């Protein structure tokens, strides 16, 4: 099994998949990883190792976080993430949860992007109107959804171009 196959097990599989169910809080992240391990025919005792190897190449963009942190004195900064129930603890452990005035995690609110409700939750928490908000995401469907609400959308391709677009809007 190659990386793409494992990535499909971890993140893909459609709306009834283990990943999708974990993303809206129907199952926990731990239950999802146990499902992945079962599909890989690996023992549950190897979950931590497999998870750490899978995410081992991920890098937190500290420059991007510092830019967002620099906005906070004058602007509200929020995050909307289609993520499992462990994200908030991860953000706190890695010391960047404080960058955000609001963090909306799909597993916690039981709805995922591109559903309108998740954007509305974030807007309500930040106490801003859609036309006052800028949303950055890598998925075109999520950008289209935010724009339908009246938010400005920036499709993330790389940090440099996203920052350039964001600075132009702000």
Question: Where is each model-derived feature located?
Answer:
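N-terminal helical cap/lid subdomain that shapes the substrate entry/recognition surface
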Residues: 1-62
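Short, acidic loop-to-helix structural element flanking the phosphoryl-transfer center
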Residues: 44-78, 116, 159
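A mid-sequence interfacial segment
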Residues: 62, 66-96, 100
